[in-house]
């Protein structure tokens, strides 16, 4: 069994990379691939770069050349669910693009031509994430829709647009839908497990940059627990 793990930024993959043994590094097309083992599980850790195009390029190479049995997307996200606070975890049930609009041709908002409106996370991987969560004392998590776009959502106007068109959204970020769409086309199961680095409509004394290392720690701990359960 081989697990693909994807994070966009160096900060989001650093803790996982440090835990790897027998690691080999390959740089290709602006992406960095670390192959080795974590806690006895064979993994390929991808640092894709930020945004949907970078994520799609990296995921395509990951699936085509390394052929993992599953994909875990880790890192940070912006919270939209009112119960979420900094450091909480979100687990995807489905993923959608929030910045795609071909509704003029009869598609749903967020749906790309020829693609499903939503990319459904794998049920077994969602349950695995829930089991991992049970082993993390006091870690709060919400399970639901995660939306992706090539923008850091920080204006009231964009937040309102997303809430209007995707009322069940729990979090937003910048890579997951590209990863999910690529996994869908390769028929590889995926789940998104991220930690909240900022929350819409909630003031925080910490900025995104300040909280990112803590979000990376929370999401990495979830991945570690999931890998332990896979052994």
From Swiss-Prot:
Organism: Vibrio vulnificus (strain YJ016)
Biological role: Catalyzes the irreversible cleavage of the glycosidic bond in both 5'-methylthioadenosine (MTA) and S-adenosylhomocysteine (SAH/AdoHcy) to adenine and the corresponding thioribose, 5'-methylthioribose and S-ribosylhomocysteine, respectively. Also cleaves 5'-deoxyadenosine, a toxic by-product of radical S-adenosylmethionine (SAM) enzymes, into 5-deoxyribose and adenine.
Annotated Pfam families: PNP_UDP_1
Active site: 12, 198
GO molecular function: adenosylhomocysteine nucleosidase activity; methylthioadenosine nucleosidase activity
Catalytic reactions on record: S-adenosyl-L-homocysteine + H2O = S-(5-deoxy-D-ribos-5-yl)-L-homocysteine + adenine; S-methyl-5'-thioadenosine + H2O = 5-(methylsulfanyl)-D-ribose + adenine; 5'-deoxyadenosine + H2O = 5-deoxy-D-ribose + adenine
Alphabetical UniProt keywords: Amino-acid biosynthesis, Hydrolase, Methionine biosynthesis
CDD domains assigned to the protein according to its UniProt record, in alphabetical order: MTAN (cd09008)
Example of a GO biological process term: L-methionine salvage from S-adenosylmethionine
Family: Belongs to the PNP/UDP phosphorylase family. MtnN subfamily.
This protein's pathway: Amino-acid biosynthesis; L-methionine biosynthesis via salvage pathway; S-methyl-5-thio-alpha-D-ribose 1-phosphate from S-methyl-5'-thioadenosine (hydrolase route): step 1/2
Residues bound to substrate: 78, 153, 174-175
Protein name: 5'-methylthioadenosine/S-adenosylhomocysteine nucleosidase
Gene Ontology terms: cellular component: cytosol
E.C. number(s) listed in UniProt: 3.2.2.9
């Amino acid at each position: 069994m081989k697990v693909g793990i994807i994070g966009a930024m160096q900060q989001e993959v650093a803790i996982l990379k440090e835990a790897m043994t027998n690691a080999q590094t390959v740089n290709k097309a602006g992406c960095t691939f670390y192959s080795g083992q974590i806690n006895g599980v064979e993994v390929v850790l991808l640092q894709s770069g930020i945004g949907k195009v970078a994520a799609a390029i990296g995921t395509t190479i990951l699936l085509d050349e390394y052929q993992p049995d599953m994909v875990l997307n880790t890192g940070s996200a912006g919270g939209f669910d009112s119960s979420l606070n900094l450091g909480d975890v979100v687990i995807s049930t489905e993923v959608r693009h929030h910045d795609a609009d071909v509704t003029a041709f009869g598609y749903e908002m967020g749906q790309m031509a020829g693609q499903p409106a939503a990319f459904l996370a794998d049920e077994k991987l969602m349950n695995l994430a829930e089991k991992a969560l049970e082993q993390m004392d006091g870690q709060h998590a919400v399970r639901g829709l995660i939306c992706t776009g090539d923008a850091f959502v920080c204006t009231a106007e964009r937040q309102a647009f997303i809430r209007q068109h995707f009322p069940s959204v729990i979090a937003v970020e910048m890579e997951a839908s590209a990863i999910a769409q690529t996994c869908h086309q390769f028929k590889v199961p995926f789940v998104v497990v991220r930690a909240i680095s900022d929350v819409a409509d909630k003031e925080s004394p910490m900025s995104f940059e300040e909280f990112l290392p803590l979000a990376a720690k929370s999401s990495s701990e979830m991945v570690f627990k999931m890998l332990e359960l896979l052994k």
